[in-house]
Curated annotation (Swiss-Prot):
This is UvrABC system protein B. It comes from Syntrophotalea carbinolica (strain DSM 2380 / NBRC 103641 / GraBd1) (Pelobacter carbinolicus). A motif (Beta-hairpin) lies at residues 91-114. The gene is uvrB. Keywords: ATP-binding, Cytoplasm, DNA damage, DNA excision, DNA repair, Excision nuclease, Nucleotide-binding, SOS response. It is found in: Cytoplasm.
Length: 667
């Protein structure tokens, strides 16, 4: 049985050995909840990896956004190169859920763009969980969404062995049942092709390896791993297993039972609509559901089959769906990174999903069973009972309460770096003073983060700094994950010097080149200027030996005072450690190359900085620029749940695609 094998040039130092020992002992003792209070730059990820290596248990690391998840994935991949480190986040680049707007009688079909690379990584994650123990998965809150039954997923895998008696056509039928498509021309993930007595399968969880099954009559003569592009044999296997191409698979008896239950619910729903004189809704639900039933009967699946997952899984109404947690064994370990943010996100997912689907059910677009295709509620998440370690520089009250107030502290940085000194300055001339400090920092070839209170102020400040010749970018919530990663990398590379944001410059941004963090209007008490937010924001300058923080404020608030006191406490402890061990602080050295860089390069689209006015288009490039602008608006509308507007923008984008093609043909 494979074991976690931690590989690193470093040994635990500072507070790390004590933290590793206390957390590991707590897990072995059976403690359900523990808190690791680790300051920025103290090596929390390294501590987590050491705990995993000590307890040797399948592990889920939960992050609150894709950017942080990608960063953690890269770090764990380097620490455990011989183990199954996987990445499980939403595979949608763009996702517009189906929705109905009663006020305008507008139904918006589900529309999405799937990132094939991330889809492959999701399949790789579930496959690893069901085939080995040395698995560490880094996930976003996608892990609490319905995924399909692990029993069905594992039960329908196809086991193949050299010398095995198997009819070739039976194998082809089995592949179709687990949702592989036959394609003899375009061989890609999730397809198979047939050439005489040879069947080649491209597993959904692979990228550079496919399988070649050679038959001699009704016997498997050989199994090979091949290069899918060149057809070259990479390895010869005695046995292998092919996992399904979808997480929503079911045997024929299960499908037949599900169809009967769907028909029963449909009859009940039709009776209810007719009794309430809702004839249009009755016709609508009957037409849509009967079409889905026919597709399931003939093909084994339909578009939106996840809405019938309750019947496929054999669940009762209201029972929680199967999620990634159900693919883990009982002795799994859970780390919740930046827990003060991530925990609150978990509860919010269910409420937003429920509201949209209730409208669809009420107006006959979906049956009530669709409500059970949902994320876990917070109570269901808690009921999983997995041993959990909450990791944060600023643990919230919930985590502290769960751990009975016991906290494992990690405030000493092995690098010797101190928490940045904080300078409080008057808010009256904050912009002029900020410009002066930015120019001083740029002269040192270092970067600046600026955090504002409002989106409008961030936009105006970005524009003003740009007019002064300062290379500046604005990071906001409408920017998708891949582009956000690209922006952060460009900041590190020095393509621009100043990054302005609101609430996105706090948790998890690991940028050693940043030596100045400026907090405007620091005395405006609220969520963005709470004690935890201020400590987190200040921490962004803690990876540079010259790191410093400027708070612009006309008074010292309670949150500011708490932040100043905690920072001073940590500086004092770090100074004492440095003197005792003769450590000279040095800026963190971190490679620019990201483990997910290839994905970013494939999917990154540079959006135009200035939106062009609608008008006549003279070149394909003009149309491309307009398509990019419309796409940005569409993504923003979808993120704000403005489904009707997003659908209109999507249609506009499709029209522009046709226009670009016609212009190219004319040219």
């Amino acid at each position: 049985m494979a074991k976690f094998n931690l590989k690193s040039n470093y040994q635990p130092r500072g507070d790390q050995p004590q933290a590793i020992e206390e957390l590991s002992t707590g897990l072995q003792r059976g403690d359900k909840h523990q808190v690791l209070l680790g300051v920025t730059g103290s090596g929390k990820t390294f501590t987590m990896a050491n705990v995993v290596a000590q307890v040797q248990r399948p592990t889920l690391v939960l992050a609150h956004n894709k950017t942080l998840a990608a960063q953690l994935y890269g770090e764990f991949k380097e620490l455990f190169p011989d183990n199954a480190v996987e990445y499980f986040v939403s595979y949608y680049d763009y996702y517009q859920p189906e929705a109905y707007v009663p006020t305008t009688d507008t139904f918006i079909e589900k529309d999405s763009s799937i990132n094939e690379e991330i889809d492959k990584m999701r399949h790789s994650a579930t496959r690893s969980l069901l085939s080995r123990n040395d698995v560490l998965i880094v996930s976003s809150v996608s892990c609490i969404y319905g995924l399909g039954s692990p029993e069905a997923y594992y039960g329908m895998l196809i086991r193949l062995e050299t010398g095995m008696q198997l009819d070739r056509n039976a194998l082809l039928k089995n592949l179709v049942e687990i949702q592989y498509d036959r394609n003899d021309v375009d061989f890609h993930r999730g397809t198979f092709r047939v050439r005489g007595d040879t069947v080649e399968i491209f597993p959904a969880y692979e990228e550079k390896r496919a399988l070649r099954i050679e038959f001699f009559g009704d016997e498997i003569d050989a199994i090979c791993e091949i290069d899918p592009l060149r057809g070259k044999v990479l390895d010869r296997l005695e046995r292998t297993a092919v996992f399904p191409a979808s997480h929503y698979v079911a045997t024929r008896p299960t499908l037949d039972r599900a169809i009967r239950e769907i028909q029963d619910e449909l009859r009940e729903r039709l009776t209810w609509f007719r009794e309430n004189n809702m004839l249009l809704e009755a016709q609508r639900i009957e037409q849509r559901t009967m079409f889905d039933i026919e597709m399931i009967e003939e093909m084994g699946y339909c578009q939106g089959i996840e809405n019938y997952s309750r019947f496929l899984d054999g669940r009762q109404a209201g029972q929680p769906p199967a999620t990634l947690f159900d693919y883990f064994p009982d002795d799994a370990l859970l780390f919740i990174d930046e827990s003060h943010v991530t925990v609150s996100q978990i509860g919010a997912m269910y409420r937003g999903d429920r509201s949209r689907k209730e409208t669809l059910v009420r107006y006959g677009f979906r049956m009530p069973s669709a409500l059970d295709n949902r994320p876990l509620t917070f109570e269901e998440f808690e009921a999983k009972g997995i041993q959990t370690i909450y990791v944060s520089a600023t643990p919230a009250d919930y985590e502290l309460r769960k751990a009975d107030g016991v906290v494992v502290e990690q405030i000493i940085r092995p690098t010797g770096l101190l928490d940045p000194p904080i300078d409080v300055r008057p808010a009256k001339d904050q912009v002029d003073d900020l410009i002066h400090e930015i120019r001083l920092t740029i002269k040192q070839n270092e970067r600046v983060l600026v955090t504002t209170l409002t989106k409008r102020m961030a936009e105006e400040l970005t524009g003003y700094l740009g007019e002064l010749g300062i290379k500046v970018r604005y990071l906001h919530s409408d920017i998708d994950t891949v582009e956000r990663m690209q922006i952060l990398r460009e900041l590190r590379e020095g393509l621009f010097d100043v990054l302005v944001g609101i609430n996105l410059l706090r948790e998890g941004l690991d940028i050693p080149e940043v030596s100045l963090v400026a907090i405007l209007d620091a005395d405006k008490e609220g969520f963005l200027r709470s004690e935890r937010s201020l400590i987190q924001t200040c921490g962004r300058a803690a990876r540079n030996v010259a790191g410093r923080v400027i708070m612009y404020a006309d008074r010292i608030t309670r949150s500011m005072r708490a932040c100043l006191d905690e920072t001073e406490r940590r500086r004092t402890a770090q100074l004492a450690y440095n003197e005792e061990h003769g450590i000279t602080p040095q800026t963190v050295k971190k490679s620019l190359r990201s483990i997910l860089e290839d994905i970013a390069e494939k999917d990154y689209v540079e959006l135009p900085q200035v939106a062009e006015e609608l008008g006549d288009y003279h070149t394909p490039q003009d149309v491309k620029n307009e398509i990019a602008r419309v796409k940005e608006e569409m993504l923003a509308a979808a993120a704000n749940l403005e489904f009707e507007k997003a659908a209109e923008l999507r249609d506009r984008m499709l029209e522009l695609d046709k226009l670009e093609l016609s212009i190219r043909n004319v040219k």
